[in-house]
Amino acid sequence: MDVNSGSWLFREEPLEVIKTIFRRALGAETVREARLLDGGLFNTTYLVTYGAGEERAVLRLGPVERHRIMGFEQNLMAAEAYLYAVCRDIGVPCPEVLAWDTSRTAVDRDFMITRYIPSVAMVNAEMTEERRHDLCFQLGAYLRRLHQVTGESFGFVSRVLEGRHFDTWSGAFLFEVEDIVGRLEAFGGLTAGEAGAVLAPFRRSRELLDQVRKPQLLHLDIWAGNVLLDRETLEILAVIDSDRAVFGDPDFEFAAPWMEDPALRRGYGFPEIAPDDRERLERRRLYRAFYLALDAYVGLGEYNNQALYRDKKEELLELLDIGKM
């Protein structure tokens, strides 16, 4: 499975380990098959057939080499379980969680088991442009519903569930920026001078960031690969991979490069940024810099992808107008 194996975080497990997980988590006495699914670079994912009735479930095993993962990624299974519970309550389709565990007793990794949904990922589905437009519009409406959920504090849900609450958006946002940039420097991806230059515009923008006063629940990973469709009707069956959710600014969600689809933005009713709205424009620039720094670190420290690291670092320094140091 070459598509998976380059990542430092990926590791296959023997069938006996998967049997132990299902026996302890679900009381399943038999596991007939565990088929590795393609595409996992962060988690290692299997489609598992188990039990006397040969039920099927998806097993997601968290990353190995946990010293490499970012701070907000340390508690993602709990965050995903939380998000799926919220989604069920507000009518956003999502997988059913059968079990999740962060004790690392059955296996030395976090894991989650969800009921298998026979489906096709939207990114792989053949459809007309009109149908794709309708689906993106519906996704925007679902996202709007999620953003209407508010929290009592700011920050990544994974952090909040660990008890790390931020009273301000700047506090939550800068905490993550400093963590990511610090990791880039520690792994040799930025010089000390570059790291300081990257952090400077964020640190001097606290007041600007704190104009955001309502902690709204963001998904942060809405794209066609994370949307499961019925193979026949092409209806949306589930929105998945909700573990990187944040209580924060909706503009942060829409600053991501995969959020440019016009139909999705219309379905959401997103208020586009006016050309003379300097404050929102500057926040968007900082948000885009965040995504570039994150992707640069993912390439360097997690996925063993030097091309991704180099490209995103170059874009980051260009966006922030930082020359070679």
Predicted regions mapped to residue ranges:
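Phosphate/pyrophosphate-binding loops and the adjoining catalytic core of nucleotide-dependent enzymes
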Residues: 2-8, 18, 35, 84
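Active-site Asp-x-Gly
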Residues: 169, 215-217, 223-282
